């Protein structure tokens, strides 16, 4: 529903865009590859608290689940995210029988953004590991009281089967999670920006996060963007990665921004977003906003903010804490 006009808007995936559930875009489910050999071989298990986003699902509401966690291998942007895009496209474009969808393997590869010119062996080498990682990603819904615990455990994809000789792919999803595939708070994610950011996984990850935000978003803290990337390097290095990724997003024409500081906290003010990487006919619709002037902070408040930052507590964390009370 377009809030400004009241018009019902249908979002349809095609080769240039995909409809992505907002939850998976905002959460750190798909993250950059850990570059260093030291980090790439350990701590590869990712654990994400998805309670705030996924307790809105009818499954969680019906069963009274109050905690949702996503656990599994790190899913990267360069291969795994594109495979997930292919899965979303498959369920949107093809006839779903029961909880399964079947389509030609070559077509599935195209939906994953893999050129059909690649050999069958190279297709398998790219798709097979990604399907295994996605199928190995567990989503658990639970509720615990003083005496008992109830938990429902499922997977991002229940099963995947392919046969290159017969040219088929079969994908099976948990019917109770179909709502996740067709979440009511969807955004249209343009793949043009993703394709323009080949091998720039940090920029790709920040793009999926920023594009999921509402129109005229509030300033985004540097700490929040660090959390979205879920890197393992020192904070100083992570800050450099975030700034480099934001500059890459500006270079391809997706956005413009200003970095500001309030107290000891750094923020990015987003002036506009252009998922098609070109200016609209009416640029006034972008509502570019000047950066908010830095608010004067008392020395006492500055000390408190510095202590919170030292403890790794962000303003987002405080907001969630107050909401939960």
From Swiss-Prot:
A single GO BP: DNA replication initiation
Superkingdom of origin organism: Bacteria
A Pfam family: Rep3_N
MF-aspect GO terms: DNA binding; DNA-directed DNA polymerase activity
UniProt cross-references to InterPro entries, sorted A to Z: Initiator_Rep_WH1 (IPR000525), WH-like_DNA-bd_sf (IPR036388)
Keywords recorded for this protein, A-Z: DNA replication, DNA-binding, Plasmid, Plasmid copy control
Region (Disordered): 279-298
Protein role: This protein is essential for plasmid replication; it is involved in copy control functions. In vitro, binds to the DNA repeat units, BCDD'D'', EFG and HIJ.
Family statement: Belongs to the initiator RepB protein family.
Name the UniProt record assigns to this protein: RepFIB replication protein A
């Amino acid at each position: 529903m377009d809030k400004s006009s009241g018009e019902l808007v249908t979002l349809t995936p095609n080769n240039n865009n995909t409809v992505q559930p907002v939850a998976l875009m905002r959460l750190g489910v798909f993250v950059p590859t850990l570059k260093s050999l030291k980090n790439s071989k350990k701590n590869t298990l990712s654990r994400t608290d998805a309670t705030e986003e996924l307790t809105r699902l009818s499954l969680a509401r019906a069963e009274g689940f109050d905690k949702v966690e996503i656990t599994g291998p790190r899913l990267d942007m360069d291969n795994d995210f594109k495979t997930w895009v292919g899965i979303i496209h498959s369920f949107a474009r093809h006839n779903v029988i029961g909880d399964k969808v079947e389509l030609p393997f070559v077509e599935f590869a195209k939906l994953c953004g893999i050129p059909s010119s690649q050999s069958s062996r190279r297709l398998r080498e790219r798709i097979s590991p990604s399907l295994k990682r996605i199928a190995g990603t567990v989503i658990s819904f639970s509720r615990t009281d003083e005496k008992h615990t109830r938990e429902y455990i499922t997977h991002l994809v229940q099963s995947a089967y392919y046969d290159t000789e017969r040219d088929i792919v079969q994908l099976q999803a948990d019917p109770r999670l179909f709502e996740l595939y067709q979440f009511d708070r969807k955004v249209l994610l343009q793949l043009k920006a993703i394709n323009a950011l080949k091998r720039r996984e940090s920029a790709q990850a920040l793009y999926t996060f920023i594009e999921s935000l509402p129109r005229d978003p509030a300033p985004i803290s540097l700490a929040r963007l660090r959390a979205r990337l879920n890197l393992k390097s020192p904070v100083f290095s992570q800050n450099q990665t975030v700034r480099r990724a934001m500059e890459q997003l500006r270079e391809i024409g997706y956005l413009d921004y200003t970095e500001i500081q309030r107290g000891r906290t750094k923020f990015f003010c987003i002036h506009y977003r252009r998922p098609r990487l070109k200016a609209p006919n009416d640029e006034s619709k972008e509502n570019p906003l000047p950066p908010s002037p830095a608010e004067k902070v008392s020395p006492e408040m500055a000390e408190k903010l510095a202590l919170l930052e030292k403890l790794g507590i962000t303003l987002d964390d405080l907001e969630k804490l107050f909401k939960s009370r």
